[in-house]
């Protein structure tokens, strides 16, 4: 996905990527050049929330994978609340996107990226300190949009 955005040449993108990807010096250099910055998954990494909102304020488009991992079965998993917190704090539209792989082997299959209608800030505005319930509602809204894009109305690709 970072290569797709970079090759499009349309806009400036930043990506949230798992910190393990930054351990190899060459790969770290490469993905940083593509606009990636690390997140410590599973640790409630709040600094990534601040860095994400800073990137958005700088006029960059943020690409985040709210599930925190890729799907092994093609189904959309549970999203993390970080995506909701970033959405609430940034005050910008969220464009849901779903990546669909036609084959079982992701690296050897045709990929389709589907984009949904933007979720507008006024639809998710909750104030400066959203409650856990509000964050769950925002996350559910965004993940529901992604699920519909990936799995369709009947729950399949």
What is each PLM-predicted segment?
Residues 1-43, 51:
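Catalytic core of membrane glycerolipid acyltransferases/transacylases, capturing the structured
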Residues 47-157:
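Non-catalytic C-terminal accessory region of glycerolipid acyltransferases
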């Amino acid at each position: 996905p970072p290569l797709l955005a970079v090759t499009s040449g349309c806009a400036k993108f930043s990506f949230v990527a798992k910190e393990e990807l930054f351990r190899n010096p060459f790969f770290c250099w490469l993905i940083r050049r593509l606009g990636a910055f690390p997140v410590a998954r599973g640790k409630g990494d709040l600094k990534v929330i601040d860095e994400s909102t800073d990137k958005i304020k700088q006029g960059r488009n943020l690409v985040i994978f709210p599930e925190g991992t890729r799907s092994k079965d093609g189904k959309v998993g549970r999203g993390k609340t970080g995506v909701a917190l970033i959405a609430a704090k940034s005050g910008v539209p969220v464009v849901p996107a779903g990546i669909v792989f036609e084959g079982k082997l992701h690296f050897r299959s045709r990929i389709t990226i589907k984009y949904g209608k933007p979720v507008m800030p006024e639809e998710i505005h909750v104030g400066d300190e959203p409650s856990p319930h509000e964050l769950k509602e925002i996350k559910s809204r965004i993940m529901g949009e992604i699920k519909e894009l990936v799995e369709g109305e009947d729950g399949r690709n």
